[in-house]
Amino acid sequence: AADYFMYTCYPADGDYLPSLYFGDSNIAANGEGVLKLLWTLGFQKTDMLWYLTQVRKNQAKESMPTDTPMGLLYTPDLSAAPMQPSLSLSVVYERMGWSMMRTSWEKNTTLLGVKCGHTWNHSHADAGSFILFHNGQQVIKDGGNCWYPNPWYREYFFHSQAHNVLLFNGQAQPQEQQYK
């Protein structure tokens, strides 16, 4: 679980630690609370300390800063944090259909996230969409995000055209869910 948060983050200069998201969260969402709880429960990897040093204070509602009771109790000693994690530069999460590739774990490098696999259940027709970070910026974003009651949700954001998906001969992915 901890590796997922590290692989989806984009170390960069700025006010928050950006993360990959495909219209289902927000760019500042992070796993700070999850990693601190895992650490406290004994699931400890030094790479987790690196991640915790990258998260900015109060960057998201999931945060657990040290000036709160939970943060004070669950924040590990970060002095042993490595300069960079020992994780590989790429990973594929086959079961969820996500892949991440990066040039380095240093700040402001390049990160490509690709969403692939089936479009089913609660998904959009966005298999094959991608997000690109480069030189500290999100260069290619996923445009498919709006509130469910908004009429544009079904009329536009649910469809391939709202995402970074390649169309073949002008054809997009089927709009119907594969599994209802």
Kindly give the residue locations of the regions a language model identified.
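Carbohydrate-active enzyme catalytic cores, enriched for enzymes
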Residues: 1-139
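Active-site rim segments in enzyme catalytic domains, especially the processed small/beta chain
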Residues: 125-180
